[in-house]
């Protein structure tokens, strides 16, 4: 039995990267199906703010923790097998979420949303996959382009409410399920592992322990928890935020969330490119400063629409540049045979960074004054602390990439 797909040096790197990015778009769309319709569900199911926040946050949790497993499995089986597997595994949860929405069952929605998180693990596959196709000096661009798969979040925010209005809740989810199946077939036909891919057949636990012992793993995890976690949290909670603070319709909130997500996605590519030409530390520092400044402005609830746009779009750009810069940093510093393992941990912590903010926002919302001041101030403080940590403790000159241990390179 063949457990690993052989690398194919004849395939074109650009085609492989674009297809991998497409897989990410569809999986991110599936992963973010709940958020854009959350205000409708809150009315339909008579949910409290905390119940609504839990419903939105649950897929994020599994999408975060599952990245550790998919990262490890990608080191062993390669990106092709894992992309196909995650696409297929996401189909049933998507359909069950649609059915739960159709019948108005909150318990079923939360349980199905838990398994929907599988779609969010796709990110831990794409980073090592891209690294296996591109030389180190091009990996910032490659990981940045793959990161544009986060556009699936924008697509979900923009199209999901419209599809639900035109076709109904279950049919909307069925459309995404069909897209996942078609994507899996396309991967089977076209996608190949890169020529640098060597299966890491070491036992899972030693690989995970080895990655966890690397200082770079935790340095990058802390940073990614803020920038990617902030992106995920805002993209999932912004429909609720804009409806609550500005009383936008579900479609209007979706349009603004889509603009936020798209700005972050485009900025992620910019962050990766900048990190290829500038020391990544400075890219990340600029991003953290932008996050702190723009979130502080948001505390004062600028009026819609011009001033909110001038607040949240630059915030999205800062988060996007930060995500691109951090992962370009990871791809340069992680050991070659453990990139998937390190990526899995970093991506998991980043996802967890997106899990807690919706819960915090739901718990700290002030209905008397109609604001989320406490949650936003906490984000400002965290960004400032990480700016200081990065500026003082992380060196501007990067150490050379660490060699893989003999055991992990087997």
Language model region names:
Residues 34-38, 216-269:
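Extracytoplasmic gate region of multi-pass secondary transporters
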Residues 65-103:
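Conserved MFS/SLC helix-loop-helix module at the cytosolic interface between two early adjacent transmembrane helices
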């Amino acid at each position: 039995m063949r457990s690993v797909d052989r690398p194919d040096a004849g395939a074109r790197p650009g085609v492989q990267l674009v297809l991998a990015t497409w897989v990410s778009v569809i999986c991110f769309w599936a992963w973010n199906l709940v958020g854009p319709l959350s205000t409708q569900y809150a009315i339909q199911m008579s949910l409290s703010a905390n119940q609504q926040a839990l419903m939105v946050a649950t897929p994020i949790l599994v999408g975060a923790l599952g990245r550790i497993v998919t990262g490890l499995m990608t080191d062993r089986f390669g990106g092709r097998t894992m992309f196909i597997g995650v696409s297929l595994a996401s189909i049933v949860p998507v359909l069950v979420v649609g059915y739960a929405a159709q019948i108005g069952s909150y318990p079923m929605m939360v349980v199905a949303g838990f398994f929907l998180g599988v779609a969010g693990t796709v990110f831990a596959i794409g980073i090592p996959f891209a690294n296996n196709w591109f030389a180190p000096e091009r990996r910032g661009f490659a990981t940045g382009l793959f990161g544009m798969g986060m556009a699936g979040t924008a697509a979900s925010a923009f199209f999901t409410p419209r599809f639900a209005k035109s076709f109904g809740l279950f049919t909307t989810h069925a459309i995404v399920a069909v897209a996942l199946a078609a994507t899996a077939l396309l991967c089977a036909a076209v996608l190949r592992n890169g020529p640098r891919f060597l299966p890491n057949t070491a036992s899972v636990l030693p690989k995970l322990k080895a990655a966890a012992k690397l200082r770079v793993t935790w340095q990058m995890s802390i940073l990614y928890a803020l920038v990617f976690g902030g992106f995920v949290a805002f993209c999932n909670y912004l429909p609720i935020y804009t409806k609550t603070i500005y009383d936008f319709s579900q479609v209007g909130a979706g349009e603004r969330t889509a603009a936020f997500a798209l700005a972050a996605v485009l900025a992620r590519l910019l962050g990766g490119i900048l990190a290829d030409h500038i020391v990544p530390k400075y890219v990340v520092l600029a991003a953290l400063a932008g996050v702190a400044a723009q979130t502080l402005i948001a505390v004062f609830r600028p009026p819609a629409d011009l001033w909110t746009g001038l607040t949240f779009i630059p915030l999205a750009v800062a988060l996007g540049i930060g995500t691109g810069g951090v992962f370009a940093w990871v791809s340069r510093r992680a050991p070659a045979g453990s990139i998937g393992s390190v990526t899995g941990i970093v991506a998991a912590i980043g996802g967890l960074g997106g899990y807690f903010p919706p819960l915090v926002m739901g718990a700290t919302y002030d209905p008397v004054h109609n604001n989320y001041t406490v949650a936003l101030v906490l984000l400002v403080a965290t960004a400032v602390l990480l700016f200081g940590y990065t500026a003082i403790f992380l060196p501007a000159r990067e150490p050379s990439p660490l060699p893989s241990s003999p055991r992990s390179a087997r």
